[in-house]
């Protein structure tokens, strides 16, 4: 029952969502005028006194309370309008757009940190499991004739096993990412894929001012390529250790351990490990440390 009662934050968010989704897109004079008129309306409400209005002090307080959530939501939207106008005027082009940010914050990895790290950890476990087994099994089963054949034969075997592990990792990556993306798409209106990524205040420091779609694509490519690096590194470790169990344990400690440490509340490890590439939003925002 408690979950069905909207909180202050929920109501404020709904008003912010209303203002942004109603006006999102390229900035126009009409949109600027609309927001200025709303700002004036709220200023009048919160500057009311019994002397300058036909309301009593009690009625004024009641009216201000009734508009509290709408005013808070509008203020958040208006600050975004000012941000966009300032950036566009500074560049002399109407490039940045009004965008309802919340859904994109989840897609970029700016929110729900622990949930995101769990998803990445599942992908890392899949990468390590597949990579430690494909060659490790050869050693465990003493299939040494395959590994001691010729240099060309060893290379072909390694590449074949590497391809298998890449494929398994890619499939798991898709199975983890697609439901997460669909969940966000189902909960938030994402209608500005072509807008510049710096249109959003939380992504205003992006080192590449590409489209939002391009930014999301870059994040996914960074994650997948990093997972492939983990696969390759794990297989190389397997060649050295010649034991699938030891390879899996050490690889999980090397690549999964930092994710668990960051999940546990030590954010600095993000910048000192592959976490920064597996979760590349901070790097793309120019945050190296």
How does the language model describe each region?
Residues 1-7, 62-138, 159-240, 279-289:
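Secretory targeting signals
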Residues 2-95:
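Long, solvent-exposed extracytoplasmic domains/loops
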Residues 138-145:
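Hydrophobic transmembrane alpha-helix segments characteristic of membrane transport
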Residues 148-154:
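Short helix-to-coil transition segments within interhelical loops
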Residues 155, 244-245:
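Residues that define the loop-to-transmembrane-helix transition and helix capping
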Residues 171-177, 257-265:
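Hydrophobic alpha-helical transmembrane segments in multi-pass membrane proteins
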Residues 245-258, 276-277:
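Central hydrophobic cores of alpha-helical transmembrane segments
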Residues 263-289:
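Extracellular/periplasmic helix-loop-helix junctions in multi-pass membrane proteins
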